[in-house]
Amino acid sequence: MIYYNRTRIYIYGQYKNIPRIKKGHTMKLNIRLTAAILACASILTSASACSSQNASSATDSKNESSIAESSSAESKDNTKSDTTSDNSSASSESTASSDGSSSENKKPVGVDGVQTNGQLVVDIDGHTWGISLYGGGDGANYASYLNEFKEKVGSSVNVFNMVVPTAGAYYLPEGYEKYNASHRDSINSIANKLVNVINVDGYAALEAHTNEYIYTRTDHHWEPLGAYYAAKAFCEMAQVPVKELSTYKAETIEGFVGTMYAFTEYNERIKNDPDTFTYYIPSTDYTATYYTTDFKVDEQFTQFHSIFVDQPASGAYSTFMGGDQKIVKIETANKNGRKLCIFKDSYGNAEVPFFIDSFEEIYVCDIRYFDLYAPDFIKDNGITDVLFTMCTFSAVGENAEGIKNNLLSK
C-alpha cells in the first residue's frame, strides 16, 4: 500500500522523503523526478525483501495471535535482558541509561494480532492497538549532522539531543520481537556518537511511566502526557524550571482515530476503539507569532497568537500549532534570558507547551520544512539553547537528511 503527501511517500511501512527544493535554490525537474523514482524503487525492493522474509519465517498462515501465544508461554521463564541497556556507556555529557530491566523485555500479552503494511493490529488488555514495526538503524548520519551543527554554532550555544521511541518499544506484545528492532539500541548508538552535544535519555524518561496513557493506540504519535515526561527530562538537563503537570489545564478530545487507521488499510478494529486525546495548557502568559519556513510573517495567522488550534476529533494531534510547515516564535512572561530553538519532527509538537514555563523565548522549527541557514538563524536571534527532538523513525531514517539539506545548507 502506498500513501502520498506533498513531501513523503509511505510504502509498505516505511517513509521516504520526496526531494524538496529549498527556497532560493534551483534543480532541474528531470533530476528531481529521477531521484524520486529511484528512491521509491529502492523502498519497493526493500519492502519486497522484507515481505519475503516475513513469509518464509511464518509457519502458520493463520493470524499472528498463534505465534504470540506460543511464544508467550516459552518466554515466561526465559526473559532475556537487553544487552545494550546493560552494557551501554554514557559520555560525561549524556544522561545515564535506565537499569537493565528494560521495558523491551517486559512484553504485554496480545491477542488477535494481524500484520498489515508494516503495522501490527493487536488487542492488549481489552483495547486495540496499531503499532508501527521498527526496522532499526544506528543513526550515524543523524549524529554526524548534530556534531557538525554544534561545531558551527560554537561553545556559546548549548546543543541537546533527545530521540524518543515510538509505542512499539514498550507495548509490542510477546511473540513479535523478531519483527521489531530495538529502539534502545538505536538511541544508545546515537548517544555514543555525539561530540559536545548533550544527550537526554528520552527512552528512560518514558520507560518509567509505561503504565500510564503516554502513547496513542490509533495514531503513530504519543499522547501529550508522554511528551510531558520527555520535556521534563530535557528541562532538568538544561537546568531550567519545570512545573508539575497539576499546574496545567487539561483539555480532552474524545473519539480520536489517528493515522494508524489508514496505515493499516482501514482496519475496522482501529476505527471502533478510538483514543481519548488529552492536552495541557500552561498557566504562564505567552504570545505566539507564526512565520513561513523562511521566517516571514505568515499573513494567515496575523490575528492568531495561541499555540493551540481547534481541531475535529480526527485531527486531534494537529491541535499543536496546526501542523508542521511553519516556524513559530513564542514569547513568554519568563525573564530568565534563556532562548530555546527546537528542531523537531511532528513528535516535537506535543512537547512545546511544556517549555513555555521554562524559557523566555521559544522558536519551533521542523527539520523537514526550514529554508534558512540554521547557524545564522541561531546567532541572529540570540538563541542560547538548541534541542533536536524527534522519534527514532526520523533519527535513523530519511527525515534526518533534512538537517543536512535544510538546516546546514546555505
Located regions from the model:
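Short, Lys/Arg-enriched N-terminal segments with co-localized hydrophobic residues
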Residues: 2-26
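Extracellular glycan-modifying ectodomains
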Residues: 23-24, 29, 49-69, 74-410
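Sec-dependent N-terminal signal peptides of Gram-positive bacterial secreted proteins and lipoproteins
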Residues: 29-53
